[in-house]
Amino acid sequence: MAELWSAISAALPVTEAEFPLDFSEKVEPSVVDVLKRCRQQLYTGSGRWRQNAQIILDFSWEKLNTGTWRDVDKEWRCLYSYGCLFKVAALCRDDASPATVQEAIRTCDLGLLMGAAIMDNILQTFVKILQNEIRKRHSNEENLSEGVSAKKMKVDCVSVPVVKQALAVPRIHCPSLESFKKDYLDPQKPVILEGIIDHWPAFKNHPWSIEYLQTVAGCRTVPVEVGSRYTDEEWSQTLLTVNEFIDRYIVVKDASSLGYLAQHQLFDQVPELKDDIRIPDYCCLGEGEEDDITINAWFGPGGTVSPLHQDPQQNFLAQVVGRKYIRLYSPEDTEKLYPHQLQLLHNTSQVEVESPDVVRFPEFVKAPYLECVLQPGEVLFIPVKHWHYVRSLELSFSVSFWWS
């Protein structure tokens, strides 16, 4: 316990006076007083430390869940992160049992997911310390939630479409920046790029597998979509550790439902995985900076579906594990694709692409499209606003790069 607390305290400012607590007038003085008490207790080790941290968490949680997420002031997200910081420190000082360490990691993850970066992203530093503590206590086999190799994996019984050659997305091997810009980016034409990610550590140094993902990220808490597609009425979201997600939705346990770790910035949360990938060179043709590129993870079993939709940026979809069937439609044919009228889903089609209701949506069958089965090691360029439908054919891990 002393060793863990020593590592945690070493990540903190040396003195209380150096510990920053700078908030605007939006944060009530009474709340700032609780923060200051937590800071004092952090350095003296006395008082109702953990209870005060929970007060901050409860107060800021209400602020985070008032109105729409985009309108939440950054001050409240920072406040939530401070609450997580103080709670983690209290947990690690009082107790260092395996359950407590896991609770501390979950608290850090909630701060990383819901809060804002504070003090040079100190919560990420805490996670590294806590993960090292777990790895010291357990061998990889003990840490792999019973060991995936000993379990029966969910069998993916999904249909594999036959891609018609006339409708196939064109393919090109390692085009130059100039030729990609001239032939595909400028005219906004989809294309599959081959041979541009073969050098990724995710393929070479430590190929991504269930076991590897559990080793580097098994104890991390992530958002999971539950349901076959986000337009379904029974669709929902929940928070699970990666180990729990794999146990519940990758390994046979509840074959009646699908879980999908979808459109999540996992690589900001787990830097070890970010080290396994590289931003495609072609992103330099955009107008934004590298920091403006949004990198998302898409991990789930066969049968997961992203309904026909469009994105507001250029997209490189890199396939690392498994295969995906993808169909693309030009934005010029938007009217034939019957977008939802609701503002929340205006970028999503009402049509079930592979089993369309031709009575309700008669024009859909007249819309031309391209299609492909994206294989591991391939990258699909999806031009901005191009409609695309995606279905996993088996256990799959994809990485998307949104850029302008």
UniProtKB/Swiss-Prot annotation:
PROSITE patterns (alphabetical): JMJC
Known cofactor(s): Fe(2+)
Organism: Salmo salar (Atlantic salmon)
Predominant place of localization: nucleus
Source taxon at top rank: Eukaryota
Stored Pfam families: ARM_KDM8_N, Cupin_8
Top class in the EC scheme: oxidoreductase
InterPro entries: ARM_KDM8_N, Cupin_8, JmjC_dom
Function (record text): Histone demethylase required for G2/M phase cell cycle progression. Specifically demethylates dimethylated 'Lys-36' (H3K36me2) of histone H3, an epigenetic repressive mark, thereby acting as a transcription activator. May play a role in the regulation of the circadian clock.
GO cellular component term of the entry, any: nucleus
Cofactor: record remark: Binds 1 Fe(2+) ion per subunit.
Keyword Transcription belongs to the record: yes
SMART domains documented for this protein: JmjC (SM00558)
Protein name per Swiss-Prot or TrEMBL: Lysine-specific demethylase 8
Record GO terms (molecular function): chromatin binding; histone H3K36 demethylase activity; histone H3K36me/H3K36me2 demethylase activity; metal ion binding
The reaction(s) this protein catalyses: N(6),N(6)-dimethyl-L-lysyl(36)-[histone H3] + 2 2-oxoglutarate + 2 O2 = L-lysyl(36)-[histone H3] + 2 formaldehyde + 2 succinate + 2 CO2
BP terms from Gene Ontology: circadian regulation of gene expression; G2/M transition of mitotic cell cycle; positive regulation of DNA-templated transcription
Subcellular location: Nucleus
Gene: kdm8
Keywords carried by this UniProt record: Biological rhythms, Cell cycle, Chromatin regulator, Dioxygenase, Iron, Metal-binding, Nucleus, Oxidoreductase, Transcription, Transcription regulation
Enzyme Commission number(s) of this protein: 1.14.11.27
JmjC domain mapped to chain residues: 268-404
